[in-house]
Amino acid sequence: MNPFPLVVAEFRRNWLGSAAVIALIATAVALGVALSAQEGALRQASARAADRFDLVVGAPGGPTQLILTTVYLQPAALDLLPAAVLERLQGTPGAVSVAPVAVADSYDGHPVVGTTADFATDGGRIAVVDGRRFSRADEALVGSAVGLPVGTRLRPAHGSPAENIIESHEHGHAFTVVGRLAATASPWDRAIIVPIEGVWAMHDQSLGERDVESPAALGPPWQSGRIGPVPAIVV
């Protein structure tokens, strides 16, 4: 028996209800496909953001928050590693790269991240599309999604008032934007990246104001007694 004539007859008899059922089925299928595609894209973006974080060293505590803050730049008040840990790690045989990462400040809703120029550019794999890398402790790179042109002077605020993580106040130390990084499709596209020495100077740790304009003051390697505590170290 051929069922198609019955289906056609039923559709003609109640075409409005049949069309509604077809539309609902099509919408459900489309939503399922869209959600699956979004989930896949989110997984890929998350994996891509974590590609260069082979090993993250932090103080004892919550490893999940350490990763969320260091890799995905979610603001949080992390415990600090003593300077001796960074000093010891940078002298470890086989450690190709040792990069401190400090996410504690913000500017105009963008996280201000202290690290090294090599880590900011992933060893040169992330291009500087406008300007150059920072070479002084009072200079900054911006991610592709930060709307600050090269030459902008900015003063970060300690904390993140939008998240109510820690009390916010503006620092007296200013940075000049000297370059813009290519897009990476990661949270770091929204970051303002400064030398870790600039972060230490802002917080009066290890590097004095007299050294912020000296290219020789930027590490690695960092001299003993010239290292401040950091929330995380990427090895």
Regions from the PLM with identified roles:
Residues 32-111, 121, 136, 222-223:
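Hydrophobic, regular-secondary-structure patches
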Residues 169-174, 180-235:
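Mechanotransmission and gating elements of multispan inner-membrane complexes involved in transport
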Residues 1-33:
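N-terminal Sec/SRP start-transfer signal
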Residues 147, 159-168:
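Short, charged beta-turn/beta-strand-edge "cap" motif at the junction between a beta-strand
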Residues 59, 81, 114-115, 142, ...:
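A conserved hydrophobic position in a structured secondary element of the catalytic/binding core
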Residues 110-157:
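Short beta-strand boundary microenvironments
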Residues 52, 93, 107-110, 115, ...:
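Extracytoplasmic
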